[in-house]
A protein has these predicted regions:
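Non-catalytic, usually N-terminal nucleic-acid engagement modules in DNA/RNA processing proteins
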Residues: 1-72
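Low-complexity, acidic/Ser/Thr- and charged residue-rich accessory regions of DNA metabolism proteins
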Residues: 2, 244-311
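Extended two-metal-dependent nuclease catalytic cores across DNA- and RNA-processing enzymes
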Residues: 2, 78-260, 304-305
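Short glycine-rich phosphate-binding loop at a beta-alpha junction
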Residues: 7, 52-59, 105-109, 132-136, ...
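Soluble or luminal CAZymes and related metallo-dependent hydrolases
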Residues: 33-37, 87, 113-114, 241, ...
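Hydrophobic, Leu/Ile/Phe/Ala-enriched alpha-helical segments that form helix-helix packing faces
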Residues: 42-46, 99, 125, 277
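Structural alpha-beta junctions
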Residues: 49-50, 101-105, 150, 278, ...
Length: 311
């Protein structure tokens, strides 16, 4: 039985690494910020949590269904001035290959968002009765998945562990209220507008009082903060944009888990990884003897713990 699985929101890691290590280049001068940064972070978290299975999920296209409702959905990410999309995509291909050579299970569907695929992977692992599922991401959207004891959202930067028991402490709302909270305050990173003049405190107070937006809309009480008619319209739009469960239920056939090279359980290949390091001047990975051993040990744990293949 797989006791612990790590799921990496790989694009989230890539964006951070792309900017954090922006001075890194190979011998020809090509940027290698994400090529270096993503394996660096993944190895640190694998060493920290000692999982039996590691899955890195990469973003594809923005959801066509969400774009119909909100044409500017995630538009700000596309329009960043300090962002070289062509170079980012080049590095993304190399990162997927590098992680694969380390024995990391890589998921990528060019037509789907990572959030939706991560939701599907979580449901798959829960069906396989995996003991603990840890999602590595700083994206607050994933807090909505921490409604059962087996799911943990870990932010490697703040080091917060969001669970069904800790979400209220860290965020001021219950994990099950995440979608309603984001509906009220909006999400700037995704270009989703919330209810006018409702910020974090007002949203937390609203949810503390009413429990949920649905409960408020069904009740007879009138709020001085929000109008029921206006909130009803915003809720209908934002709930679909934000709720991974709602999207999954409506478009489940569209969300396919595509394993990189059709291999859900790749085997670490030291020779290929050394070639990867040589091609991109990643000498530190080769000098640190423990780096590759982290993934070799992961592979051994994975083989011992798996009884049924994921498909």
């Amino acid at each position: 039985m797989v006791e612990t699985a790590l799921i990496f929101d790989a694009n989230n890691l890539m964006y951070r690494a792309y900017h954090r290590f922006n001075s890194f280049t190979d011998v020809s001068g090509r940027p290698t910020s994400a090529i270096y940064g993503v394996p660096f972070v993944v190895e640190a978290q694998v060493r920290k949590f000692q999982p039996d299975l590691v899955i890195a999920v990469f973003d594809g296209a923005r959801s066509k269904h969400r774009l119909k409702i909100c044409p500017d959905y995630k538009g700000s990410r596309v329009q960043k001035l300090d962002f070289d999309k062509e170079d980012f995509l080049r590095q993304k291909e190399e990162v997927m290959e590098g992680l694969y050579n380390l024995g990391v299970s890589v998921v990528h569907n060019p037509d789907q968002e990572a959030d939706d695929m991560i939701y599907s992977v979580v449901k798959l692992l829960q069906k396989q009765r995996v003991g603990t599922i840890i999602i590595i991401s700083s994206d607050k959207d994933f807090n909505q998945l921490a409604t059962t004891k087996d799911v943990v959202i870990y932010n490697p930067h703040s080091q917060e562990k969001i669970t069904v028991n800790t979400c209220k402490h860290f965020k001021g709302y219950e994990a099950k209220q995440t979608v309603d909270y984001l509906t009220l305050v909006g999400d700037d990173s995704d270009n989703i507008k919330g209810y006018p003049l409702v910020g974090e405190k007002r949203a937390q107070q609203f949810l503390e009082k009413y429990g949920s937006i649905k409960a408020f809309l069904r009740g007879s009480e009138i709020s001085s903060v929000v109008s029921k008619n206006a909130l009803q319209k915003i809720y209908k739009k934002n709930h679909f944009l934000i709720s991974l469960r709602a999207y999954h239920l409506k478009y489940m056939r569209d969300v396919k888990i595509n394993w990189y090279k059709n291999q859900p359980f790749p085997t670490p290949n030291k020779s290929l990884f050394e070639n990867y390091c040589g091609a991109f001047t990643l000498k530190s990975f080769l000098k640190d003897k423990g780096f590759y051993e982290t993934f070799k040990s992961l592979s051994q744990r994975s083989i011992r713990s798996r009884k049924n293949n994921l498909s």
